[in-house]
Amino acid sequence: AYFSGGKPYELFEASRGCPFDCSFCFIHQFRDMYRRKGKGLRLRTPQLVVDDIKETHRQHGIKQVMFVDSTFNLNKKWLMEFCELFAEQTDLIMTVNIRADIMDDEIMQALAKARCNPARFAIETGSEEMRNGILEKQLTNEQIQNTARLFKKYNVPFVTYNMMGMPN
């Protein structure tokens, strides 16, 4: 287990892959490299992930789970089931990486119920033109603002990823 602020936590991966093609990200390179080797996005079953978390908690006394998945909210049905199981079967806190343009009220409610603290999402830059042009992120300022409002509405803390030192 790792420690953050004196609290033990563990890193988990519930999924691998990402369908987006952001120019700066390595994940789509893996997808291209392994194109004929199976699915580009693979999800573990929600119950299996929760079972692994419970066993790690039993063995190491963790208090928090940090998911390293690129985009935890890619599959809404999966996320809803996982959050329900996590909330029912653990008393832990979780941290996830999400994409702002695929957030909605229902997903936010599920994350809040599952004690998500914090959620993380990438803005990359305040310039929408640079974000969507150079970085090929395809994410509008309005989508970012709407997601921030959802976090505030459900009182879920969030952290943003930002790049520094880009051209212009």
Labelled PLM ranges:
Residues 168:
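Active-site glycine- and acidic-residue-rich loops that bind
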Residues 1-164:
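Radical SAM [4Fe-4S] cluster-binding motif and immediate context
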